[in-house]
Amino acid sequence: MSDNITRSTALVTALENVTTLSPTTTQAINDTNITVPHKCLLLLYEDIGKSRVRYWDLLLLVPNVLFFMFLLWKLPSARAKIRVTSSPIFTTFYILVFVVALVGIARAVVSMTVSASDAATVADKILWEITRFFLLAIELSVVILGLAFGHLESKSSVKRVLAITAVLSLAYSVTQGTLEILYPDAHLSAEDFNIYGHGGRHFWLASSCFFFLVYSFVVILPKTPLKDRISLPSRKSFYVYAGILAVLNLVQGLGSALLCVDIIEGLCCVDATTFLYFSFFAPLIYVAFLKGFFGSEPKILFSYKCQVDEPEDVDVHLPHAYAVAKKEGMDSGFYSSTQIDTTAYLDDVALYALSCGQHQQHRQ
C-alpha cells in the first residue's frame, strides 16, 4: 500500500511538472517556429535605438548628403564652365545629378520622419519610385547620347533624346510602383512595416536581366562587326561605366533569382546592389562624364566671338565621338581617348576663339 501511494504521488508530481513546464516549452517551440527575420531583412527596417530612424535610411542618406555638399561646393565653377561652352548635354547631366541627390535626401528624410502607417508606407514607396525614375532617365540618356554623339547636331535633337528617355523611365517606374503598392511582395514584409521591394522578386529579376544584357552588349560593341558601321565612343570611361552597371545588374539578378526560389540569402545581394546604386550612381556619372569637363583649366578667357548674331536654334558643337580605330596606321588601341572628350573639346574652343581674336587684331 505504501509503495502504491508513493508511486501515485510521484506520478501526480510528474504530471504537475509537465503541466507547469508545458507553457514554457510551448512558447520556446513557438519562438523557434516563428520565422526569425534574416539579418539582411533586419537591416531594412531595424530602428536605431528607440528612435524611428532606420539604419537603412541613414546609410542611404549620408552618401547623398556628402555628394550634394560637393555639388554645392563645385557649383560656382561649374556654372562658369557651362556658360562658356553652352553645352546642353553637360548642362542636362549636371541638373539631373543635382536632382537625383536632392530626391535621395528627401526620400531618406521623409522615411525617417513618417510613422509605420499604411499612408506613410505608400508615401515612402512613391519617393523610391521618383528617385528610380530620375536615376533610370540618366542611365538611358548616358547610353543613348554616348552612342549617338556623332549624330546629334542641335539642341532640339538632344531634347528629343531626353524626352524619349523620360517617357521610357516613367513607364518603367509606373509599372514598378503599381506592382509595389498594389501587389507587395510578402517576402519583404517585416512586423507591421512593408519594405520597399522594387516591384517584387520576379519583376526585379526580369529587369535586372534585361539591363545586364543591355550593358553587356554596350561593353562588347567595339568587338563586334558593328564597329565598322557606326561611330562608337572611344573614351574608356564610357565602357567602364557600362561594365560597372552590367556587373551591378548581374549581382542584383542573382540575388533576385535566389529570392524567387525562397533562398533568403539572396536578399543580402540585392541589399548591397541597392545601396550602391541609390548612393553612388550619381557620383559615378559625375566622375565618368562630368569631372573632366568641370575640372579642366581653361587655356584662355572665352570672351571673344567671331560671330555676333546667331540663330535661336544654333547647332551645338558637341564633343565628337570618334569611331574605334580599325584602319592601318591608326594605332589607338581598343579604347582610345574620346567618348565625351571634354578637355580636347575645350582646347578646340579656346584655340578657335584665340585665332578669331588674332585675326580681328590683324585687320585693325
Swiss-Prot record:
GO molecular function: G protein-coupled receptor activity
Subcellular location: Membrane
Keyword vocabulary terms for this entry: Glycoprotein, Membrane, Transmembrane, Transmembrane helix
Organism: Gallus gallus
Transmembrane helix in keyword set: yes
Glycosylated residues (UniProt): 4, 17, 30, 33
Pfam families hit by this protein: Tmemb_40
Gene Ontology CC terms, in alphabetical order: plasma membrane
GO BP: G protein-coupled receptor signaling pathway
Transmembrane segments: 58-78, 86-106, 133-153, 161-181, 202-222, 244-264, 275-295
Coiled coil: none
Keyword Iron (UniProt): no
Family membership noted in the UniProt record: Belongs to the UPF0359 family.
Listed name of the protein: Transmembrane protein adipocyte-associated 1 homolog
Topological category with respect to the lipid bilayer: Multi-pass membrane protein
